[in-house]
Amino acid sequence: MREKEVTAHDLFKAEYDSMDWCIKKTNPLYLQLQAIDKVLDEMPEILNCVHRDIAAPTGRRKLKSRFGRPVQITSEQALRCAILKQLRGYSYRELANAIDLTSVYRKFTRFYGEEVPHFTTIERVIKVISEGSLQEANRALLLLGIKKKVEDGKAIRHDTTVVQTDIMYPVDSRLLNNTVRVLTRLMSRLREAGGSVYKYSDHSRRSKKRAYQIIVGKGKNIEQRRTLLYRDLLKVQKEVVVQGEKMVALAAGHNQLSATGKSCAAQLRKLIPLAHQVYSQAWRRVIKGEKVPANEKLLSIFETHTDIICRGKKGSPAEFGHKVDFAMGKSGLVTRYEVFRGNPGDNEVIERALTDHINLFGHPPKKLTADRRYFSAANELVASDKGGEKVAIIKPGHLNAARKQLHKQPWFRHLMNWRAGIEGCLSTLLRTFGLKRCLWKSWNSFNAYVGVSVLTYNLRILAGHILQI
């Protein structure tokens, strides 16, 4: 049976401070962890959301070791490890070492004098927590903020940012070489598991050489030579894909295949359609000279959900990841976030955001502000109809006399100046809480990563308000 929590101890009682004689009790990190600990103890709903995922049958299957021994870590410890990881910016290995060596971290994560699990165990448990549960946990935390009168929801500001996926810059030659490399590796493992009947030719060296020549090629007539190199690389990739398809067909009729062989065959079956897509887009762009639409491009065979985001920013013409919309109140708490697929316009989110805001706070925001990308006449009308008294969104382009006068109003300028503060909050999320780049794999894990970062950020903001009180 999965344990939900360990026996509760007062984190800062004297009997647990024997190892902390050298720690200054006015240390900001110590006080911050103390406040976060109190918030988590006060809100069992947050732990319930996490425990539901870890204790579910699917969660138990993911956490079962090869030998059938369950992972010895409670849901509460997993939640606190996830929070500490994002709060301090640790990798999983650094997190396990820091908890093991620091008595304050041991107390915060509720390990006390127990043996700290291996970092891979901590990783597996944290990755079980779903994005839906983190959304619910964040909502429960916001309700606590409302109850403590930290946030009233009377003023709201919006902005978007891009969270990158963990991929290399997408180049056709690199994508083609990646498909050859991974297909060859899987075919090699399938042959080891299934015997010599699974035959293939290893073209990975030739593929790597062609990809390298394409990337570093210089000199005269480079475009013509690069096209010839691409033709050869495309030919190699096509040959490897054909071999992979033959191996998958053989594996389908092989009843005595081991578990490893079946796993390799399943991965081959999943990768082959992606290899066809990579071949198609490279052929269209390089050989035929077509402009491939962004929604038809595959940017990575590992993170297939990655989108191209073009926001027109100087120095970053294109970003690879997902656009995320954030709404924040006067307290600095993130009251709402939404991860998008594709690259929708920012002006499409206001109506949904207002509906969610009313569901959370019970009333519309009296003041709403956002940058010019959110502007549309429909958005201003919707905000006013839902009860917004002051809506400050700069209209791009030509302005008539009435609009110019509106932009000069003191309340309008005050709201736009206040809106600028969200840039600093987003910078903190990106730099301090790991939202610059998501290192978790798959679309669901991407959403969960954003969720745990926002939850940790809100916990720190709420803890800061509690310390001031």
Describe each region flagged by the PLM.
Residues 30-83:
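Basic, short loop/linker segments at the boundary and entry of helix-turn-helix/winged-helix-like folds
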Residues 63-75, 89-134, 146, 156:
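Trp/Phe/Arg-rich N-terminal binding region typifying the photolyase-homology
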Residues 81, 95, 116-122, 152-164, ...:
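Short, conserved catalytic/metal-binding motifs centered on acidic residues
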Residues 112-303:
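Active-site- or DNA-interface-adjacent structural scaffold in DNA-acting proteins
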Residues 268-274, 410-469:
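Basic, amphipathic alpha-helical segments enriched in Lys/Arg and hydrophobic/aromatic residues
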Residues 305, 313-360:
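Electropositive, glycine- and tryptophan-enriched low-complexity nucleic-acid-binding patches
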Residues 367, 372-439:
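Helix-centered, glycine/charged polyanion-binding patches within enzymatic domains
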